[in-house]
Amino acid sequence: MKDIKRLKTVHISEADLLIIAVIVHCILKTDKMYVNVPALIELKMQKFDKHFQLIVLEKEEFIDEVKDKDIQAFTEIIPHSNEAVHSIVVPSDVYDGACIGNFQDRMTLAHELAHYILHGILQIPVSELQDGEICSKYEDPEAIADMLARFLLSVCGLVQNMSTAELSAECGLSEQDAVSVQKEYKEGIAKILFSIKTVLFKHKISSKSAA
């Protein structure tokens, strides 16, 4: 595996990610409060994308592949015959943990699924950060993937206005992620409403001008 580089992407807000999460749930028909992430990836995604594969490696084999014990999983998008082969690669202990409901392991798989959706399906580009260059959380591929992962795991609970404790218990998030996603949801809704109001205001102005 190549050295990990610091990357940036286009500006993506909470509103964008919330909309993406809702669309994904609608397309895949995942109406359950608790999202079974391994099943979602293995059954739903592989039917949706014939080029997608989930690769589970033994922990030692995974470490040999990534050369970094701190990396929990990774997503690869490899061009092949003018099409992309999409792979999520995880060690067996993370996969097994996600299967039994471990918060961190569920989040790890959801994070990689978010990368796949954003950069595999939607083909949102990433570029390498130059020396000394910084980017906001809205341009950081890792922060963005974390936000989308939280939305994917909890959007059904968020729309029901669940409390932090309820989100954690019913949707399988850690308490910290539940707190974060509640804030991100409020920001996302506020930005969506602002966009709608802006469009309506512009339409009202243009209608008056035409009259």
Question: Language-model features: where?
Answer:
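Active-site hotspot residues in diverse enzymes, especially metal/ion-binding acidic/histidine motifs
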Residues: 1-211
